[in-house]
């Protein structure tokens, strides 16, 4: 993983799986999302000001899983508690959402997929972006991966037509 080009995936869920395995929490999912749930269950509390990001810089818009896991392994080998590593991982993901949004001039962020059922991650997103961003989550459509395609269709239609569609009423701001 740390030699060659790193883990290549477009699914954050697979990165949750890899971290869970690295931390000896779950090597094989017996159901979809098990590793992510077990990671989340390890977090009993956190203070956002005490969190540290494993990734500070995005190079050419690419998020380096190699750098992510190199920094996680550094903390693991130094004896940092598992719970702190997991908390910093969630914090890293939350910070990345806003880093990408800022680089692209986006203030309205729609979050979908199984990863955004993680209560700790969602709490961090609200804490970090509460005043500067509008966060949207599924209310009537399933938040699981099967509805990521809905967002992809909206992006495609907006780019193809060079105009923005109104967000349907059923997808309302969740605060």
Regions found by a protein language model. Give the residues of each.
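A short acidic Gly-Thr/Ser loop motif
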Residues: 12, 113-115
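Conserved phosphate-binding/catalytic loops in two-lobed NTP-binding clefts
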Residues: 108-112, 119, 125-148
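Short, glycine-/Ser/Thr-/acidic-enriched flexible segments
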Residues: 17, 24-26, 116-117, 140-143, ...
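Glycine-rich phosphate-binding/hydrolytic loop that grips phosphoryl groups
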Residues: 83, 90-91, 95, 136-175
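A contiguous, well-structured pocket-lining segment that forms one wall/lid of small-molecule binding clefts
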Residues: 1-108, 120-126
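Hydrophobic alpha-helical segments
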Residues: 22, 103, 128-136, 153-160
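Short, Lys/Arg-enriched charge-dense amphipathic segments
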Residues: 3, 10-14, 131-136, 158-164
């Amino acid at each position: 993983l740390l030699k060659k080009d790193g883990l290549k995936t477009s699914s954050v869920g697979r990165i949750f799986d890899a971290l869970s395995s690295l931390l000896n929490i779950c090597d094989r999912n017996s159901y979809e999302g098990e590793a992510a749930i077990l990671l989340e269950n390890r977090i009993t509390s956190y203070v956002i000001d005490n969190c540290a990001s494993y990734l500070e810089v995005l190079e050419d818009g690419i998020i380096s899983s190699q750098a992510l896991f190199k920094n996680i392994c550094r903390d693991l080998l130094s004896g940092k508690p598992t719970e702190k590593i997991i908390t910093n991982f969630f914090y890293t993901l939350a910070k990345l959402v806003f880093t990408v949004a800022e680089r692209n001039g986006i203030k309205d962020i729609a979050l979908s997929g199984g990863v955004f059922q993680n209560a700790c991650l969602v709490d961090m997103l609200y804490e970090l972006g509460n005043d500067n961003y509008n966060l949207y989550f599924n209310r009537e459509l399933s938040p699981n991966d099967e509805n990521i395609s809905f967002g992809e269709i909206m992006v495609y239609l907006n780019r193809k037509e060079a105009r923005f569609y109104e967000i349907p009423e059923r997808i309302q701001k969740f605060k």
